[in-house]
């Protein structure tokens, strides 16, 4: 797990306060499903995922993306205990859903890309470094249940 400096925490929290969770969440999950199509197998119940436009316009993708980012927002308040914060989600994704833990890393990287697109020049290399540290730590926390 990454150690977060006070500067990291301030940088992450500051940008998070400006994130539109619904838009960024839907775009992040949508892009994951388009760029890494093998991840679609976990979302059979979401209906039409046959093309990029179908995925990006799918209301279930948008809703789940918002749910994912809402969960991430809660974790931002507990950066020093991400493993504890994500213990139940790790168990669910490992034991019940059998999600490949590599997918958490991919999703984090897609989120960083989406934030860069949304925030442009405000998403400086320093901001990116703090966010990359955070999504890496979250992916590690979500993978903690895996053996």
UniProtKB/Swiss-Prot annotation:
Residues annotated for heme b binding in this entry: 64, 93
A Pfam match: Globin
S-S bridge residues: none
Phosphothreonine modifications at: 13
SUPFAM superfamilies: Globin-like
Residues modified to Phosphoserine: 45, 51, 53, 140
Cited InterPro entries: Globin, Globin-like_sf, Globin/Proto, Hemoglobin_b, Hemoglobin_oxygen_transport
S-nitrosocysteine: modified positions: 94
Free-text function comment from the UniProt entry: Gamma chains make up the fetal hemoglobin F, in combination with alpha chains.
Organism from which the protein derives: Gorilla gorilla gorilla (Western lowland gorilla)
Chain positions found as N-acetylglycine: 2
The name this protein goes by in its record: Hemoglobin subunit gamma-1
Organs and tissues of expression: Red blood cells.
Modification N6-acetyllysine, positions: 60, 83
Protein family membership: Belongs to the globin family.
Domain Globin: 3-147
Gene that this polypeptide is encoded by: HBG1
UniProt-recorded Gene Ontology molecular function terms: heme binding; hemoglobin alpha binding; metal ion binding; oxygen binding; oxygen carrier activity
Any single biological process term in GO: cellular oxidant detoxification
Residues annotated as transmembrane: none
Subunit structure of this chain's protein: Heterotetramer of two alpha chains and two gamma chains in fetal hemoglobin (Hb F).
UniProt cross-references to PROSITE patterns, sorted A to Z: GLOBIN
An example Gene Ontology CC term for this record: haptoglobin-hemoglobin complex
């Amino acid at each position: 797990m990454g150690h977060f400096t006070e500067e990291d925490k301030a940088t992450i929290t500051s940008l998070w306060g400006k994130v539109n969770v619904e838009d960024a969440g839907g775009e992040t999950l949508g892009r994951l499903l388009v760029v890494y199509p093998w991840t679609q197998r976990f979302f059979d119940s979401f209906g039409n995922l046959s093309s990029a436009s179908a995925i990006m316009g799918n209301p279930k993708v948008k809703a789940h993306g918002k749910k994912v980012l809402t969960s991430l927002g809660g974790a931002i308040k507990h950066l020093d205990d991400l493993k504890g914060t994500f213990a139940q989600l790790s168990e669910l994704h490992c034991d019940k859903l059998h999600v490949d833990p590599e997918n958490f890393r991919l999703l984090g990287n897609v989120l960083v890309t989406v934030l860069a697109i949304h925030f442009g020049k405000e998403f400086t290399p320093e901001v990116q470094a703090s966010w990359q540290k955070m999504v890496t730590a979250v992916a590690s926390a979500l993978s903690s249940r895996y053996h």
